[in-house]
Amino acid sequence: MQVRIFLSWCHRNADLKKALLADLLPVLGIFTDLEVEWWEDSHLTCGEEFLPGILDRLDEADFGLLLLSTHYFASEFIRQHELPRFAGPAADRGSLPVALAPLPEFRAEHDLGGVERQLVFTSGSRSFAELSGHRRTTFANDLAGSIRRRALAENGYRSL
């Protein structure tokens, strides 16, 4: 099965994003039952219009991998153009929310665009940024497995 994933992230988290993808992308690439096509804004080409280029890729995506942080939720661009496609009442694409950095407690006084109603991927309630060494690799491996199960709709009942 083929799946298209749009990477939604805040540029202030570039180092964390790079570290996560260094371990995540190779694992996604070795699945035999899932072919992942990946897109992020760095794939825009010279002369391409920024906003239409991003909106077109959003339209083509099956899922959005949301790399969550306080900077992510504070980004006006993300809140206006990307997040509504993956969370909240107007969402029309699958969401794969990941705690890239520590997040505020999901409380009524925080506007998290609907993500607060979704299961956010963590490692034992810890974000990727809170881990180091082999624990980061394990985080990426487990995230790849979670992405695979969601893409293949293997999130239902299981035999005992």
Task: Show which residues each predicted segment covers.
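C-terminal interaction surface of TIR/SEFIR-family domains
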Residues: 1-22, 26, 50, 60, ...
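Short His-Asn-centered micro-motif
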Residues: 40-41, 67-68, 112-115
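A generic short-segment signal for beta-strand/edge and adjacent turn/coil regions
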Residues: 7-10, 33-36, 64-70
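Extended hydrophobic secondary-structure segments that form protein cores and membrane-embedded regions
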Residues: 5-6, 36-43, 97-102
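Alpha-helix termini
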Residues: 25-33, 88-92, 154-158
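General secondary-structure edge motif
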Residues: 4, 37-38, 66, 90, ...
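Conserved beta-strand-loop-alpha-helix hinge of the TIR/SEFIR fold
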Residues: 55-107
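Conserved BB-loop
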Residues: 23-55, 70-79, 126
